[in-house]
Amino acid sequence: MKVRPSVKPICEKCKVIRRKGKVMVICENPKHKQKQG
């Protein structure tokens, strides 16, 4: 999980979602998981 000021999808399988007001990227590749914070 990477915490970044700006989250972007890295590959085609990355999905940008909102969870409890936070923007997150979820993906099949665990290295691509990101959280805004």
UniProtKB/Swiss-Prot annotation:
One of its GO terms (biological process) is translation. Signal peptide: none annotated. It comes from the Bacteria. SUPFAM superfamilies: Ribosomal protein L36. The keyword Hydrolase does not apply. Keywords: Ribonucleoprotein, Ribosomal protein. One of its GO terms (molecular function) is structural constituent of ribosome. GO terms for cellular component: cytoplasm; ribonucleoprotein complex; ribosome. InterPro entries: Ribosomal_bL36, Ribosomal_bL36_sp. Part of the 50S ribosomal subunit. Belongs to the bacterial ribosomal protein bL36 family. HAMAP family: Ribosomal_bL36 (MF_00251). This is Large ribosomal subunit protein bL36. It comes from Bacillus subtilis (strain 168). The gene is rpmJ.
